Amino acid sequence: MRKEERYKGVLNWFNKHVPVAETELHYDNPYQLLIAVILSAQCTDKRVNMITPALFRDFPTPEVMAASTSEVIFEYIRSVSYPNNKSKHLVGMAKMLMSDFDGVVPSDIDELQKLPGVGRKTANVIASVVYNKPAMAVDTHVFRVANRIGLTNNSKTPLETEKELVKHIPEEQIPIAHH
């Protein structure tokens, strides 16, 4: 089977069986989604959804979180993986949102990646989910499965996988394709 046929088959299957693909993380605004995605690194969405209600309640804006400390944030997120690093990233992210972006989560992938705790995958999730940009978030699962079913030519990195996938997926489907 040719690669183009493989892509078409996969996209058709998902369009038929999962017509509304969306994140399982619970959030009400871009700031909350950014926090949730940062926390979800090497952690389940279920666990993140258990701890974010209290975090979102007590730190409803970047301004409030920026005024806090990583020690305080740690107490809210202690049950996620790597809470020490993530608590520092969240406070740093909030401070940078306030100082560099007027408290607004940026839509540009390069700008997003300047925020502490935000790598390419997280930036792509925010760009695609919040701003409906054609950004492909490639995590370890997408990377592994894309290689396994022949959507890529044995790419060696998530970035190689991302570039290969976006070449073959229609632009309007990219924002939902990573789900």
Where are the regions that the model predicts?
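Catalytic cores of DNA base-excision repair glycosylases
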Residues: 2-179
